Amino acid sequence: MDRLRQRADFLAVANGTRGNSAAFVVQGRPRDDDGPIRIGFTVTKKNGTATERNRIRRRLRELVKRLDVISMRPHHDYVLVGRRSALTRDFAAMLHDLRSALDRLDRQPPSKAGRNRN
């Protein structure tokens, strides 16, 4: 698995499908190339101080490390958008939430391409 680092990649994934959870939102989008799964993490400033946002990001990264790769589809990009409740939510519950959110993403039809979210 690789990391998403470019803003354009994050924006492209934002136009894909999404699955909600109490502690995060998972966004996913298929890619045309044969590269590995790529994952990005983001937490907005409204979720607390820099220390709290970094802790949320660290918890999300650890979730993905402990997740079995079979839960994610090959040749896809994913973005986990952290919410404030990720600071206090039980880690096992968050792992279950991530698995079910990824499962819901697989069952959703692809969203309309080029949709503008302003």
Question: Which residues does each PLM region occupy?
Answer:
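Positively charged, solvent-exposed patches that mediate nucleic-acid binding
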Residues: 1-118
